[in-house]
Structures are given as structure tokens and as C-alpha cells.
Amino acid sequence: MILDHVQLAGPPGCEGEARRFYGDLLGLDEIEKPEAMRASGGVWLTLGTQELHIGIEDPFTPARKAHPGLRVDPPELDTLAERLASAGAQVEWDDRYPGVRRFYTADPFGNRIEIGAPAG
């Protein structure tokens, strides 16, 4: 068994903001949704061999505790944190996970995102 994808929700009409945040800021690549699923809206993206799906939820409630944890190479972590902060996203560093440097941020819809790298 492998993890195929993670889904987060966004409010109706969030696709443009999702593309900017996950694509332009985080560097994920958008993939085409199957034709039969396009009418429901949302955006699908890839992270290496896994996928991140942003689905539409109405009424929408952001995931403030449950979250995906993204891993980057150590040299990328500070650069990514700076890019997010410069774009107005909150970056909250957390040193409680031994052997990992990480921070939390939120997408434009309030969904919590963890981004980390091996320490040292």
C-alpha cells in the first residue's frame, strides 16, 4: 500500500488562489483533473510521486489542526520560508521534532501546512 494523494478543501472559487499559493509559492505542478470530475471545481497538484488535491467544500471550514507535512531539502527550507513571508503568509517555526527543522504556515484559505527538512 502507498499513499496516493492528500486532499485539502477550499471555498468555492478558490482555484486561482490555490494555483498561486501551491504552484507559484510552493513550486508544485498542476495536473489535469479527470474530465468527469472537473465540474466539481478544485485543483490537483503533484509533489514528486504523490498528489495534493484541493477540493471545493461549501460551506467551507479550514483544517487548522490536521495538515499535510511537506519535506524539502535542507537548503530550500529557509528560502521557502522567506518566500512565503514575503508573500504575506505567516511562518511559525517549531523546534519540537528532534532531527527536523520545520515551520507551519497556512494556505490562503486557512488550511495548516507543515514544511520541514532534516536538521543538520
Summary of predicted features, one role per range:
Residues D29-A63, R112-A117:
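Conserved short beta-strand elements that form part of the metal-binding/catalytic scaffold
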Residues A18-G23, L84, G110:
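Conserved active-site tyrosine of GNAT-family acetyltransferases
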Residues M1-I2, T61-K65, R96-Y97:
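Short glycine-enriched loop/turn motifs at secondary-structure junctions
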Residues A87-G120:
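Vicinal oxygen chelate
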Residues M1-R19, P68:
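N-terminal beta-strand motif that seeds the catalytic metal site of vicinal oxygen chelate
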Residues A66-L84:
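Mid-chain, well-packed structural core segment of small domains
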Residues G41-V43, A66, G99-F103:
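Short beta-strand micro-motifs in enzyme catalytic cores
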Residues G27-P34, G88-D94:
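Short secondary-structure junctions
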